[in-house]
From Swiss-Prot:
The chain crosses the membrane at residues 171-191, 194-214. GO terms for biological process: ascospore wall assembly; chromosome organization. Residues 192-193 are cytoplasmic. Disruption phenotype: Displays elevated rates of loss of heterozygosity (LOH). A combined deletion of the LOH1/OSW4 and IRC18/OSW6 has reduced dityrosine incorporation in the outer spore wall. It comes from Saccharomyces cerevisiae (strain ATCC 204508 / S288c). This is Outer spore wall protein 4. N-glycosylated. It is found in: Membrane. One of its GO terms (cellular component) is membrane. Involved in spore wall assembly. May be involved in maintaining genome integrity. The gene is LOH1. Belongs to the OSW4/6 family.
Length: 219
């Protein structure tokens, strides 16, 4: 009887948690749309807004429906949307046309690029290879040299890599508490300190790289 009650309460909690996650993601979508609308204070882009907002609303609804059984995905995407809202509200933005285009493109990627393929791909790689890859990334991030104020092609490439790594680092920071993926941190901290922000199971690395794809598209 106690076991049955435990099962009942467990599934009740799971259902409630899932419902709350869907609502929180939808709320983040609403805040994003409001922030986009607020960029057009004088109504110059009224036609553009009337065209784009229904598309974005539909994308958010479709994402909620597609991932309603995978709350960790919705929580990650919620973090991305919240970060975008914050950047828009802080005037870290481009033209309204470009911002609508970036949001639409990012949400389209969330719908059509499977996070499960990323997770599967990383699960097929041994933990040793993943840790080694992260170690190499960390080394690349720190290996930037400037000679006489002049950069050669390799140095420019290194800077571009650093920019990409910094973006990944930012999404890790944003997502840590909300994703609840803090597992197996210790073995990674020794080789890639920035990755300590996320406890890394091999599958969760794949998910984070998928999430970084969405993050890069929307920023």
């Amino acid at each position: 009887m106690r076991f049955q009650l435990f099962i009942y309460f467990y599934f009740t909690i799971v259902v409630i948690a899932g419902t709350n996650t869907i609502q929180q993601f939808s709320d983040a979508g609403d805040r994003l749309i409001t922030s986009l609308r607020n960029l057009d204070n004088n109504g110059t882009y009224e036609t553009l807004t009337a065209e784009k907002v229904p598309i974005i609303e539909g994308q958010i609804q479709n994402i909620s429906a597609k991932y309603e059984q995978h709350t960790f995905i919705l929580k990650g995407l919620e973090a991305v949307l919240n970060y975008k809202v914050k950047s828009l509200d802080n005037n870290e933005r481009e033209s309204l046309e470009i911002e609508y285009e970036k949001v639409e493109k990012a949400l389209d990627a969330a719908l059509n690029v499977s996070p499960f393929e990323y997770i599967k791909k990383f699960k097929e790689v041994s933990r040793g290879k993943v840790v080694n890859a992260l170690e190499n990334l960390s080394r690349e991030q720190n290996r930037i040299t400037i000679n006489g104020g002049r950069e050669d092609e390799k140095e420019k490439e290194a800077r571009e890599k650093k920019k990409r790594l910094d973006r990944i680092k930012r999404i890790l920071t944003v997502s840590l508490l909300e994703l609840g993926l803090a597992q197996g941190v210790a073995d990674l901290c020794a080789v890639a300190p920035f990755a300590c922000l996320l406890g890394v199971t091999v599958g969760s690395i794949g998910f984070i790289f998928w999430l970084a794809l969405i993050y890069n598209a929307i920023q």
